[in-house]
């Protein structure tokens, strides 16, 4: 037996928190009966519907690498009616994202049909490497010569693993930034703190997975044998 919200999340419908909201809103049925308690326990023999859609409890975990373009937000529904990642994806089953990229960021976004798999990737204790290429306007010397480890900005501590300059011209500089635990808008806030304006941010790696030659909007599925490792 497992909690109903967990089963919904594991099926790739949404996060566990969003699943709890759907239950409280009366959008979930078990064996034809509307359930209003997120604490309800179910098993594989129960038939579960979410917003009229029957979910598959026995599906195998799958993983995709997706090149998120600029201009999409990483959510299933946006109260401001902005375009979302999931509205643009075609040919995929119901999936959730592993982590997020903000509206103006692009690059590697991992997608999965398994809530459990998503949580394994997102656990801070697993310390999965995230690599970003960042283009910024301003004087790079201040950032590169500063101690940016354990940096406190507006009461939040940031601890990037490394920030290295790899290309520079008259107007912009390119940096490679490595994180092992990403916080909301972390890179943009660190750069802004040191007087640099980020005008392009691309995630090129998450864990052992890289963006390779994918074009914006394209995706590819990871082989199950690689996933099992």
From Swiss-Prot:
Disulfide topology: none
Gene Ontology BP terms: enzyme-directed rRNA pseudouridine synthesis
Record Gene3D superfamilies: Alpha-L RNA-binding motif, Pseudouridine synthase I, catalytic domain, N-terminal subdomain, RNA-binding S4 domain
One Gene Ontology term of the molecular function aspect: RNA binding
InterPro entries: PsdUridine_s_RsuA/RluB/E/F_cat, PsdUridine_synth_cat_dom_sf, PsdUridine_synth_RsuA/RluA, PsdUridine_synth_RsuA/RluB/E/F, PsdUridine_synth_RsuA/RluB_CS, RsuA_PseudoU_synthase, S4_RNA-bd, S4_RNA-bd_sf
Catalytic activity: a uridine in RNA = a pseudouridine in RNA
Keyword list, A-Z: Isomerase, RNA-binding
NCBIfam families with a match to the protein in the record: pseudouridine synthase
The protein, known as: Uncharacterized RNA pseudouridine synthase RF_0863
